[in-house]
Amino acid sequence: NSLYHNNDEYWMNFIKFSKHMTLSRAVRCLTIMGRTEKDQLSLSQYLYPSMQAVDIKELDLDIVHAGTDQRKVHMLVREVFPKMKWKVPVAVHHHLIPGLANTGGASDTTFTKMSKSNPKNSIFIHDSEEEISSKIKIAWCPEGISDNNPILEYCKYLMFHDSDSFTIERPSKFGGDMLFSTYEELESEYKNGKIHPLDLKLSVGRELNDIISPIRAYFSNKSELFSSI
């Protein structure tokens, strides 16, 4: 990466920025790597918050847009950059959509977010309809459990984001379709065992494909744009 290789200015800025940090502050920022203060960390991992901060400087960013797991390092940036007379970026954070695998009871999505290093645990904008369906079908979605349930998270933050209703399609022999006008209503019915996980998954898979389909089509014949992201 040209940002780091043969770039003396970058590493000089790295040292300057690090002088404004304490070790305890660096540890608190390490959740951006999916780590906690309780984990045994290598020395190199303690360097990461400073590197991410200096990346913002080197890329001359006006806005940093990321998940809520990165808010600590971005708050550090907004605190330290003025002292160094560097341009202070606007920080915009959003809810993290969790990965599709079993979270093991983890309550912090920092540890369960989607990652490109595990394709089966993630939905990508270039996934085909078949890939989306396959991933959703094997996703962790315990019957009657809403906590840390990735399929219900999709419903809450994606299905209901741009729509005021969500339909679960079911064969008439299993009670027919179910229409929900709020996420809370859907969650309640699921927790009460009124919705089978497979019915929920199939409907979420269809909705996800509808969301991703135009994006997938746009990039299908623009490989140079796709490779850039």
Give residue ranges: language-model regions.
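Conserved nucleotide- and phosphate/pyrophosphate-binding catalytic cores
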Residues: 53, 59, 71-229
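Divalent-metal (Mg2+/Mn2+/Ca2+)-assisted nucleotide/phosphate chemistry catalytic cores
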Residues: 1-93
